[in-house]
């Protein structure tokens, strides 16, 4: 959530919400119907009724587009048509829907009741409503507490040590995350949605020492991922996975080739501004990650019949998705001509501005077009109020002057006045 900028997702907020709600529902029902048709066939060795089939599909209905961002970031690739913020919004907001579907289906199966449409709508509305309100409330409250601490610390002289302030604010945010999730869950809301909204609000505030806080959160993210995959690895039995390998392969191929594309095209049908190529690529990069595997442990905890097979199938499908889709992200985007070759990839110069300065940092990659009037800074047409602080050429960093000869491919670190706080770091 903290990495999601409101200014970036605003143009794609409606398509993103459609993918994370209607898209998840359609993926679950389409794939669940296919699993139900496979059940009972002698060679599949799975025997699921309709609701358990739907439960299996629901656990796999959310995507892990963070893996896509990692691949794009490592290759320094920029996407056209606002595809990056669209996937960012979808991946951040579709886990709550998949979680609610999983919980509702588990409760229905264990209680032996019928699945009521009105009951599902009521529970979804309740969890979304409480989760959204708690996320906004906790985000605003945490932001004000951080601002109060920063003001009080500066007044007392405690704010003179940036590392101390960064540590305290990071701990405050971490505590707010746990409090937000637990309080929302206690109120019968969706804790995942509340934490995501809280993170969005905090990430769009002008937090002091933002770079240090971001690094702390990245470290915590990696730590949590290591713990999660270690625990999941302890639950896996390779022999049991082999027993369901054939049917898992069929389910995975169906979800990749039919289930996900069909749900994406239906969800995005009202939005005529999204091109066919964009829809095809969004359909292809619906990677499954750790979240579906975690959701598949819920039926095991609740002793749902066939829970062991559900876990093994989800684990197999996730590995298949990462193997097939994860290795073809870049080449599929290139085939569909969705890579923006004109955009300069983000470059981290390791420079951060003070929070009270009404300025921001930008990175510009030079091409022949920018050097048509000359190859020095004094001959370039820079925006008013801009100043070049540093030039990167290959692996060298240079402090520029008016006579430095620039060449295509140079990266300029530019400081500019009067901009929004969304791009204060470079």
Each language-model region and where it sits:
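Alpha-helical membrane-inserting segments
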Residues: 1, 26, 30, 34-38, ...
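Membrane-interface junctions of multi-pass transporters
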Residues: 3-15, 146-172, 177-251, 271-280, ...
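Transmembrane alpha-helices that form the ion-translocation and gating core
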Residues: 9-11, 15-75, 142-145, 238-316, ...
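Hydrophobic faces of alpha-helical transmembrane segments in multi-pass integral membrane proteins
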Residues: 18, 22, 26, 30-31, ...
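Re-entrant/interfacial helical elements at transmembrane boundaries that shape
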Residues: 66-75, 79-88, 98-109, 196-199, ...
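Membrane-interface alpha-helices at helix entry/exit sites of multi-pass transporters
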Residues: 79-90, 94-101, 118-119, 211-215, ...
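Long, charged amphipathic helices and adjacent flexible linkers at domain junctions
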Residues: 341-364
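Cytosolic Rossmann-like ligand/nucleotide-binding regulatory domains
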Residues: 368-424
């Amino acid at each position: 959530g903290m990495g999601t900028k409101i200014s970036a997702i605003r143009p794609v907020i409606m398509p993103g919400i459609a993918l994370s709600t209607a898209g998840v529902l359609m993926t679950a029902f389409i794939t669940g119907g296919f699993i139900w048709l496979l059940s009972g066939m002698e060679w599949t060795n799975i025997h699921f009724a309709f609701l358990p089939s739907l439960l299996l599909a629901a656990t796999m209905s959310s995507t892990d587009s963070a893996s896509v961002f990692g691949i794009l970031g490592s290759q320094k690739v920029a996407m056209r048509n606002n595809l990056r913020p669209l996937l960012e919004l979808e991946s951040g907001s579709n886990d709550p829907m998949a979680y609610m579907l999983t919980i509702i289906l588990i409760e229905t199966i264990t209680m032996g009741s019928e699945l009521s449409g009105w009951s599902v709508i009521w529970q979804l509305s309740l969890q979304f409503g409480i989760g959204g309100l708690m996320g906004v409330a906790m985000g605003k409250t945490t932001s004000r507490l951080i601002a109060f601490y920063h003001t009080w610390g500066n007044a007392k002289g405690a704010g003179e040590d940036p590392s101390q302030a960064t540590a305290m604010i990071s701990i405050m945010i971490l505590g707010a995350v746990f409090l937000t999730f637990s309080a929302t869950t206690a109120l019968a809301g969706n804790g995942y949605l509340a934490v995501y909204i809280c993170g969005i609000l905090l990430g769009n505030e002008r937090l002091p020492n933002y770079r240090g806080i971001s690094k702390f959160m990245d470290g915590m993210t990696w730590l949590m991922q290591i713990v999660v995959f270690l625990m999941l690895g302890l639950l896996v039995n390779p022999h049991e996975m082999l027993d369901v390998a054939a049917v898992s392969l069929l389910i995975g191929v169906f979800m990749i080739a039919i289930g996900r594309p069909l749900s994406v095209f239906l969800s995005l049908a009202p939005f005529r501004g999204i091109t066919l190529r964009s829809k095809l690529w969004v359909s292809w990069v619906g990677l499954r990650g750790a979240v579906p595997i975690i959701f598949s442990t819920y039926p095991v905890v609740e002793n749902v019949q066939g829970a062991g097979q559900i876990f093994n199938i989800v684990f197999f499908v996730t590995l298949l998705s990462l193997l097939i889709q994860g290795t073809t992200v870049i080449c599929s985007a290139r085939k569909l001509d969705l890579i923006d070759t004109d955009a300069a990839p983000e470059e981290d110069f390791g420079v951060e501005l003070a929070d009270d300065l009404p300025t921001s940092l930008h990175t510009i990659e030079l091409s022949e077009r920018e050097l048509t009037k000359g190859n020095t800074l004094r001959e370039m047409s820079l925006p008013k109020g801009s100043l070049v602080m540093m030039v990167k050429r290959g692996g060298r960093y240079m402090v520029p002057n008016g006579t430095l000869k620039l060449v295509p491919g140079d990266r300029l670190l530019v400081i500019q006045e009067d901009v929004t706080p969304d791009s204060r770091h470079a």
